[in-house]
C-alpha cells in the first residue's frame, strides 16, 4: 500500500498483482473488507480514493506505506459463492482482545460496540476485514472493564492467505454485519414494538 493523505480524504495505491487482470476504472474492489472504487490503474497498481466518513468508520485511516491488506474482486454471475454474501459495507470496527493457538487452530476474541452485538449470534455469519467467518461464541465481560465480545476460529489456510496470520492483540478490523441476520432481527424488533410479545405464537 502507498498512502497520499488529503484534507478530509486520502488516496491509497494498492498492488493487486494478478487480481488486477481485467480490472477497469470504476470497478469495485474490497480492500480490507471495504468496498472501494478503482479510479486509476497502472498495471497491477490501482489507486483508490477514500472519503472522510469511510476513514472514520473503518480502519483504512490507519494504513501506512507497506501495509498488507486483504483484497477481493467483485463476484461475477456464475462464480461459486462460499461462506456468505459480503458487500463491503462496513458497520464499524472490532478490536482483537485475545489470541489463543490450540494445536492446529487459532481462536481470536473480538470486542466491538454493544449496539452491533444484537446481530452477532453463535453459528451466525460475520465478515472481518472482508473474510467470511462463522461466529463461535458471544458474551459480555462483567464490569469493571466490561465489553461485548465474540470469538471466531481460523484454520491454518485462512491464516496463510489473509492478514489474520499477522494480526496481534490490540489490532482493529473492519466489521460487516450479515445483512440477512440484521434484517430478521430488525423485523422481529419492530413487530414486537408494534404488537407486543403476546401476539407471538
Task: Spell out what each predicted region is.
Residues 1-201:
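Conserved loop->alpha-helix
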Amino acid at each position: 500500500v502507498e498512502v497520499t493523505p488529503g484534507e478530509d480524504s486520502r488516496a491509497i495505491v494498492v498492488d493487486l498483482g494478478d487480481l488486477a487482470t481485467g480490472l477497469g476504472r470504476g470497478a469495485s474492489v474490497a480492500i480490507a473488507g471495504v468496498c472501494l472504487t478503482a479510479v486509476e490503474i497502472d498495471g497491477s497498481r490501482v489507486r483508490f480514493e477514500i472519503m472522510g466518513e469511510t476513514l472514520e468508520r473503518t480502519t483504512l485511516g490507519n494504513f501506512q506505506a507497506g501495509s498488507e491488506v486483504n483484497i477481493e474482486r467483485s463476484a461475477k454471475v456464475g462464480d461459486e459463492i462460499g461462506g456468505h454474501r459480503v458487500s463491503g459495507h462496513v458497520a464499524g470496527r472490532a478490536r482483537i482482545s485475545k489470541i489463543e493457538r490450540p494445536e492446529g487452530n487459532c481462536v481470536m476474541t473480538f470486542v466491538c460496540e454493544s449496539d452491533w452485538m444484537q446481530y452477532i449470534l453463535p453459528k451466525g455469519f460475520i465478515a472481518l476485514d472482508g473474510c467470511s467467518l462463522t461466529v463461535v461464541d458471544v458474551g459480555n465481560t462483567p464490569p469493571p472493564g466490561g465489553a461485548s465480545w465474540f470469538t471466531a476460529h481460523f484454520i491454518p489456510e485462512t491464516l496463510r492467505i489473509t492478514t489474520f496470520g499477522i494480526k496481534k492483540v490490540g489490532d482493529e478490523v473492519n466489521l460487516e454485519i450479515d445483512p440477512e441476520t440484521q434484517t430478521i432481527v430488525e423485523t422481529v424488533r419492530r413487530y414486537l414494538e408494534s404488537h407486543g410479545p403476546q401476539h407471538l405464537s
